[in-house]
Each structure stands twice: as C-alpha cells, then as structure tokens.
A protein has these predicted regions:
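Internal amphipathic alpha-helical repeat/solenoid segments
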Residues: 42-68, 88
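Hydrophobic transmembrane helical bundles of multi-pass organellar membrane proteins
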Residues: 58-61, 76, 279
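Divalent metal-dependent phosphate-bond-processing catalytic cores, especially two-metal-ion Mg2+/Mn2+ enzymes
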Residues: 1-43, 70-71, 86-100, 108-333
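Generic alpha-helical segment signature
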Residues: 27, 50-54, 76, 143
C-alpha cells in the first residue's frame, strides 16, 4: 500500500514543523510522520522500496533506542524532522541533495545517528576502557557503533537489494550515510566548522556527502533553535544524562568532567550560554551563509535563547541577593 504524498494532503505531514514535540503524541503518530517524510521526498518510489519494508526498518531502528533521558528515539526524530524541513524548505539544498540515494542517506542517517546509545559520551567509553572503546580503538567510539548498527539493520531487511549495484547506489549510500553519522562526533566539530567557512567562500569545494553531513550535524545542534519551552525540555534531558554519567564515573573512580558536576540553575545557564557562544552561534551563522537565509528563523530563535539565559541569570542573581524576581520579567517564550 502506497503512502500518502504531501501534495495529497497527508495528515502526518501537516503535523510536521520545527517545534513539533514528539513527546506530546503517540509512538504510532511519530512512526507515521517518519514514513510520510521518507515518502514525501520521493525516495521510496524512486528506489522501489515497498512501504512495508521501510515500515519494518523504522520499527527495527526504533527498537534499538533505549530509554535514556536525551539520546533516545524522540531525539533522533527531532533531528530527522529538522533535516527534512531544511531539505523541503531550501531550493539550493534540493538541487544539491537531488538524487534518491542522497536524500535517503540524509533521512536514514538522521534517524540512525544515535542507535544503541548508552546515555554517556565517548569520553566515558574511553576512560572506562569499555568493550566498545577497545573495538573501535578509542576513535569516534559511539558514532562507529551507531553507524555499524544502522548497516546491520538495513542489511537484515535486505535494503541493499533495492539499490542498483551497477550504478553503485548502495556504495554511494554507505559513503554518504557513514560520513554523516561519523561527523556527529563533537570532536570533529572544529574541523567541520572550518570546512563550512571555507565552503561559504567557494561552495564548489563540497561534495554531496559533505552537504548531507553538515545538515545532519546542524539538526543535531538544533535544540536551542526551537521554542523556549522545547529548548528547556531538551536541556533538562541532556543535563540528566550528564548527572547519570557523573554518578557512574564516581562509582568507578573515574575523573568527572567539571561541566557534569554541581548542575544548579546558575551553572546550567552558564554552560548553555557558553555552548551557544562558542559552538552553536558560529556554526549556525556559517550554515545560514552556506544556505542563504533559509535558516534565518532558527538563527533568530537561537539568539533569543541566548538572551533568555541572560535573563535567567539576572533573575537568579536578584533572588540570591534577596530581591526576588521583580515584576514580570523573564525569558521569552
């Protein structure tokens, strides 16, 4: 049975926007949205992938996400949704990420980029000398896990058989999707940023796989470009993961990163402001130049989040001094 196309008034696609909260709807609705996004960009028809096959793949992928606070299935849904909206909203991106294989790689790598995430970072895996760290030689440990999990799952569903081996479609898919997922390793962020800044001056230096990787990385760094209530929800979740990791490290006698300790409101706001100033703003400003103006609204929201944290710190400082919150001042919604 064929999925309903966007132009045929798909109910699932009507729900999709940047500030869509997957926690507010049923798991079935989230799955329907994912299937509709894959269908809407034309990859299922072009690659002759039956709806029941992609449905089975999505459910299999979903089963490999654990109930950790942040790196769960709803996180990757949010990343996938943002990648989809960037693709659908930018004529430039549509022209560059134009083939069915490239578009399929964009959406599938977004969906799979945190598969089997344990709820801690690479630093923990390396410090604890985990089996994963040994397997992947301390290099992009979790990203290699996510990537491997994706390909094992896709091969289990014989997805490679739907791609033309004579045209190298499966090989191209593997190249693009692998590049995208490995590029979500934050240790690669500074290198990626320099490449994006260089590409702003000369976009012709980029391959399709670079564009896909940058879009996925952008979406992965997108929480603070959402409405304030959603941004705070994701903030709570990432700091809960930090607390959980710090507790595990303390139990194992491992060194704990300072940003994972004593996470009171002031510390959290300062960490978030620093993350915006030194990571998010430079990246989003560069991407907004690479994809001219198509990310402007998200960039405005990011700057508003920065202003909101300034207000949060101001309110907390007045409370500390015994002056109360004062009036109706507070962060913008």
């Amino acid at each position: 049975m064929k999925l309903v196309q966007m132009e045929q008034d798909s109910e699932a696609l009507k729900e999709i926007d940047y500030n869509y909260n997957p926690f507010s709807v049923s798991e079935d609705q989230v799955t329907d949205n994912i299937l509709a996004m894959f269908d809407s960009v034309g990859v299922l028809d072009a690659l002759d992938i039956p709806a029941d096959v992609i449905h089975a793949i999505v459910l299999d992928v979903k089963s490999q996400y654990t109930d950790v606070p942040f790196h769960n299935f709803n996180h990757v849904y949010t990343v996938l949704q943002m990648c989809y909206l960037i693709l659908k909203g930018s004529t430039l991106v549509q022209k560059i990420v134009s083939t069915p294989v490239a578009r399929f790689a964009l959406l599938m790598s977004a969906l799979c980029h945190d598969m089997n995430h344990p709820g801690n970072n690479n630093d923990f895996e390396i410090k604890s000398e985990s089996e994963l760290a040994i397997l992947y030689n301390d290099i992009s440990v979790l990203e290699n896990l996510h990537c491997s999990s994706m390909f094992e799952t896709l091969r289990r569903h014989n997805l490679h058989k739907f791609m033309d081996s004579n045209r190298g479609e499966w090989r191209d898919f593997r190249d693009i999707a692998t590049t995208a997922i490995l590029s979500t390793d934050m240790s690669q962020h500074k290198v990626l940023l320099q490449k994006v800044l260089g590409a702003v001056k000369d976009p012709g230096t980029l391959e399709v796989k670079d564009w896909v990787a940058y879009i996925v990385h952008t979406a992965d760094l997108g929480n603070l470009t959402l409405e304030w209530d959603l941004a705070l929800m994701w903030e709570d979740r990432i700091f809960k993961e930090f607390e959980n990791q710090a507790e595990k490290e303390q139990k194992q006698g491992l060194e704990v990163a300072t940003y994972m300790l004593n996470l009171d409101e002031v510390s959290r706001a300062k960490i978030q402001m620093g993350f915006i100033d030194y990571v998010l703003l430079p990246w989003w400003e560069a991407m907004n130049k690479l994809i001219p103006n198509d990310l402007e609204e998200r960039l405005v929201c990011l700057k508003r989040s920065r202003e909101n944290y300034t207000q949060v710190l101001s309110v907390l400082a007045r409370k500390e001094q015994g002056g109360g919150a004062g009036g109706n001042e507070g962060p913008e919604a």
